[in-house]
Amino acid sequence: MPFLKTLFRGALCSIACGASLFCAADVYRIIRNYPELMPVSYMDEKGSPTGFETELIRKIAEQAQLDLKEEFVANFGDTLTALENGKADLAMATISVTPARQQIFDFTTPYFRVNPFAFITKDDSIKTIQDLANKKVSVWTGSNHEQKIKEIQKEGTGSVIPAKSIFLAVKAVIQGEADVAVGDDAYMLNFADRYKQHNLKAVIDRSTEPESYAIAVRKGDQALKKKIDDALLQLKRDGTIDALTKKWYPNRT
């Protein structure tokens, strides 16, 4: 994906440095999901990345004066692996903060709350995560959902079908290979509208605890964490985050 990588380097360098020809000495490598998660991050009609996280990271870069070089990966697991292995300095990729992940990474102040179990299905019997015990469930490989579904299915007859992207997880439902695709409500609900000709419906399990998205940085990198936290605090105070949330999630309560 060299085109996207080059495009975002130029865009974020300009944001961080303004009209100056000189950029900051510190260049931070950020890894993100490939833009196919409308409205979180996706390609617009001109072929340029856009969406909630795309606009937010640009605002953060501007506020914190960070020079960021972006790279996109399709597999969620590759996002965290790259950060853990030192191939990136930070990751912004619909990453929920969990105790297990906090053992490996440091996290910034959360910027978005999500319902972690949203389903795309044709099956009217699926209402909550407990209904997946005996179902064929398609999940994004490396996501937080994969392990949780496996735990639910320990006493059942269901199975997990790994998918390299959330689009492929939904495609498995469309093609009848899976009963349901599972993900966060931040990006799953849109699929029911986009592919309504396939009689898909979106269901949110509101019995589960909400989770929070945050930016992950390498363990111990308190300097970068503070820069981002300070930027997020200012963007919260001046209403930028609320404005972006209303823009991309107008029906969210």
From Swiss-Prot:
A GO cellular component entry from the record: membrane
Localisation per UniProt entry: Periplasm
Signal sequence segment: 1-23
InterPro entries linked to this entry: Iontro_rcpt_C, SBP_3_CS, Solute-binding_3/MltF_N
Entry keywords, A to Z: Amino-acid transport, Periplasm, Signal, Transport
Species name: Dichelobacter nodosus (Bacteroides nodosus)
Name by which UniProt lists this protein: Amino-acid-binding protein AabA
The organism's place on the tree of life at top rank: Bacteria
Cystines in this chain: none
SMART domains: PBPb (SM00062), PBPe (SM00079)
Family that this chain belongs to: Belongs to the bacterial solute-binding protein 3 family.
UniProt-listed Pfam families: SBP_bac_3
GO biological process, any: amino acid transport
GO molecular function: ligand-gated monoatomic ion channel activity
SUPFAM superfamilies hit by this protein: Periplasmic binding protein-like II
